[in-house]
């Protein structure tokens, strides 16, 4: 993969043209390239990653293998009931069934064949866990933190996370890292962790101009981009 700063130099013919470099587009590009297609990604912005890179980037998919590994059961019909409750008059039974039947299978591919790896906090509840079909955990997962140096020079073109999602310019991982920051002045272990994290952030900014410990949606966008790089998928920016 190479990142191009314009639409110049596009190949004359490809098998798949992907419009947009968020998670959906890049996952499509990586999957198609993995199966032998010649792919090109076109992005209108001057950075790749789309909304995914700027967001939390969590996935909500019931019945995932990660949940099973944690010993969390998915009651029969509960996810369908929850979606119906949340969607109200917009509920689509056929689409919901397709999502529930294929969602778990879809997320088995990235950890096996790409740089994308997921973690699942045991106690991350549905937004309305008390609603019909809601669960206290086992449906939400997040991309494992990623070292931005693995992207090489391409990290300069990765869209940053929203400032509202950062602390002192740092993207914090969910779970233990957030707990350390909230307990920094109540726990010596947390204070040491936060101090080391701040020093690492300062070093990264001096060396690379930005923090390179990538988390949440930024980590997902970066891992997908690294996977595309490995498969020689070009990304063209500023394509309008």
Predicted segments, located by residue:
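A conserved short coil-to-beta-strand element within the FAD-binding core of flavoproteins
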Residues: 237-240
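Short coil/turn connectors at secondary-structure junctions
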Residues: 12-14, 35-38, 55-56, 231
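N-terminal Rossmann-like FAD-binding beta1-loop-alpha1 element of flavoenzymes
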Residues: 16-41
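Extreme N-terminal leader/targeting segments of oxidoreductases
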Residues: 1-16, 34, 222
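Short linear motifs at secondary-structure transitions and domain/linker junctions
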Residues: 14-15, 34-37, 209-211, 218
